[in-house]
């Protein structure tokens, strides 16, 4: 018996069995819980229904301990994703530098040979964002705005990831990972 091959793609196909997802880092309604939601959009502004979003974040005290702040979500037909987490606190580096509360976001999508890496900052942390060394290193105000999640309700933030085109989200490279 001969089985047909799956269609050729730039990357993939990806198989769901064995894929670990984790969208609730804390229970919905827990003290300090926030909902982070958004869409992954392509260059034309169309949803990416087969993407994958990973997040890493510190706990409410700004510490990275264990697997507290890790999540992974497949995008839905509308390109949407959502995580329930505690809002991260400011992170103090050993040299005394303070990073604003933020979420590190990794996005996998069709057509990308490598995932893209960005950061999500919170709109209600404007003073902390302004003092954050990475956020402040981005000279263009419009580009900085692509990194800010907008509060859309009580304990709810929206962060859309635009992969290219007008309003493209700012993406970063990291020398250690090669991303």
Language model: regions and residue ranges:
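Beta-strand-dominated extracellular/periplasmic modules and repeats
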Residues: 1-179
């Amino acid at each position: 018996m001969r089985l047909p091959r799956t269609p050729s793609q730039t990357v993939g196909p990806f198989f769901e069995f064995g894929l670990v997802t984790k969208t609730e880092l804390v229970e919905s309604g827990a003290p300090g819980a926030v909902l982070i939601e958004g869409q992954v959009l392509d260059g034309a502004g169309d949803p990416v229904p087969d993407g994958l979003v990973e997040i890493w974040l510190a706990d409410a005290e700004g510490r990275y301990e264990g697997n507290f702040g890790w999540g992974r979500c497949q995008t839905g037909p509308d390109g949407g994703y959502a995580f329930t987490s505690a809002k991260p606190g400011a992170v103090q580096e050993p040299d005394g530098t303070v990073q604003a509360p933020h979420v590190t976001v990794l996005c996998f999508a069709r057509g990308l040979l490598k995932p893209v890496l960005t950061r999500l900052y919170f709109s209600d942390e404007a003073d902390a964002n302004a003092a954050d060394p990475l956020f402040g290193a981005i000279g263009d105000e419009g580009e900085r705005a692509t990194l800010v999640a907008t509060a859309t309700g009580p304990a709810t933030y929206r962060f859309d990831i635009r992969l290219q085109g007008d309003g493209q989200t700012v993406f970063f490279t990291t020398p250690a990972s090669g991303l």
